[in-house]
Amino acid sequence: GGQLLETLPIPVLAAAVAGMGHVDVELDPDGIARSVYLRAGLNSPYWPTLALALLELDSAHPAARQALPGQRAVTSPVPSYAWRRDYRVLLPFAGPPGHFPHFSYNDVLRDRIAPAAFRNKYVLVGSTATGMNDALPTPVSGLARPMSGVEYNANVFDALRQGLTIRELPPNWSLLLTGVFTLLPMA
């Protein structure tokens, strides 16, 4: 029950990186991860999600220069120690766990993977070993085979890079369509 703190990397690492981002994922009430907040931070949502930070490094890519998609957060006064999120987007997952190519770090270090496998590619590094990663249940994996955090972030990056995010229907439209589909079998 202590105060939430934002901890930056040690200075030598912080000085060496081209950008920093958050990897905060909120599960929906049913325990499934379907979305991401593109910006988050203490008292102000200023950190981009890791995938957005990566995309912003590629200033030549059109998606890096577009306005952020997503549902805006309601602004209200909050304590300075509150975690704030903004620009929520639903994700169109590219596929189930294992959809993106992945390589063992050990195999890469031992030159067992051809350099061509990485040429002109965006590369995310993370743990996928059972019990050593942040496994997330997703709509394409469910609870039986959770998706690794690095693959979840690859899906976020892929969706942003392609400009593909899912928008939620406004509540009034959702209610109307529910009514229409409920009455449809009676017609």
Model-derived segments and their meaning:
Residues G1-S80, R84, I113-A187:
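Non-transmembrane functional regions of envelope-associated proteins
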Residues A73-P115:
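Protease-associated
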